[in-house]
């Protein structure tokens, strides 16, 4: 949801990945985050238990923001580790919108958003629409400004709604694409190139058969 992403983008807009990034958080997240947790108390769980769990998660998330811890073997089967969080902060096409888990990666694996770090790919940290400013208010609000500018592109209220609450990158005219659309376009292009390559290979005359035909004609 782009409106929520506009608050969280502050955390991702740094082109560095270190412990400083861990405490780089948007002010507006306090508006929506409580809604993700209040139902736990409403179900009857003690508030103290929730606070302790959130504290443990925050500490784990803090120390994940480092590039100096290698892959951790077996525990990566179910725990969200440092290399996985590097993937989460990358703006490489193959890494975007991956590894959302706080401590466990079980749900990422279940819903297809888990991605292992490929050490042969150089990671580019940050976001595709950076604030390009050191002004704190620009950093905090630049994506909200982008949403407003996009909403003015169409008079259709459904389009306006999607610009605010649809996935980041959505556009009514195809001028920008979501990460899902980008991946689908890349995959379609790769498949097309593969088919063309196969057709070229199949239509290429066999050199041995060609030589035999030439010799037959000479004879």
Short names for language-model regions:
Residues 1-124:
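Membrane-embedded catalytic scaffold of the fatty acid hydroxylase/desaturase
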Residues 121-219:
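Cytosolic-facing loops and C-terminal tails of multi-pass membrane proteins
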